[in-house]
Amino acid sequence: MEKENQIFGIRAIIEAINAGKEIDKVFIQSDAQGELMQELMKAMKKHSINFSYVPVEKLNRLTPNNHQGAVATIAPITFVKLETLVDAVVESGKTPLFLILDQLSDARNFGAIIRTAECTGVDGIIVQKTGSAPVNGDTVKTSAGAVFNVPICKVDHIKDAIFYLQGSGIKTVAATEKTEDTIYTIALNEPVAIIMGSEDRGINPSVLKIVDEKAKLPMFGTIGSLNVSVACGAFLYETVRQRQ
């Protein structure tokens, strides 16, 4: 973790949250207590900030300073509002292409996906505030800097983002093996948002219920699945092919 992207100390983190800083995640000492810690918990809940309980040894590795049982990571980018981004892309007259990541949790996979998204002309990436990979040094490095070129939106709930996209005339397509349709039978040369699931659980069943279409990649080997960043690349480049 880069030291310039850290905030340590309970009061400092509370002030950063209240000031609107882009907090990616807060690491809290597992046995931390007290009124100030309760105040921090309330602030994180109010602003839907991701956090996890960790042993004090991990906090000591993150910073040699007096962390008081809490260390936060700050995003190296500024996130954009979903409505602002979608409306601007729709009004631009181009054929929108969005990518939704349903609680993808690995920062390196996130970075690899951002890199492919930038190369394929994705207009924006949408992630959920909780349960998603942070935008940290690993993300920036794996993306080869593409993270600074692709708008990223953080939303409270993926389903609300899907409803907004659908209401804006954008078709939502879920990448899932729970369908008979392959990617090659789905029309991707129209306004579309592709949804990729987490590494271990895939797309949430409640999300699958509300998408417009589902598609899978044909598999011919004995291994039943691909790494999510590889699968995402296949979906995005099929979209590019159809739009040529």
Model-predicted segments: where are they?
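Short, acidic/turn-prone active-site loops that include or flank metal/cofactor-
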Residues: D31-A32, V56-E57, T130-S132, E199-R201, ...
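RNA substrate-binding interface of SAM-dependent RNA methyltransferases
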Residues: E15-K21, D87-D181
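Glycine- and other small-residue-rich loops at beta-strand/loop junctions that grip anionic moieties
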Residues: N5, Q29, D102-Q103, Q128, ...
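Active-site/ligand-binding-proximal alpha/beta "capping" segment
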Residues: V173-N227
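Structured adenosyl-cofactor binding patch, chiefly the S-adenosyl-L-methionine
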Residues: I14, G20, K141-A144, P205-Q244
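Surface-exposed amphipathic alpha-helices with a cationic face
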Residues: K45, I162-Q166, V240
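N-terminal positively charged helical leader segments and presequences
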Residues: M1-A88
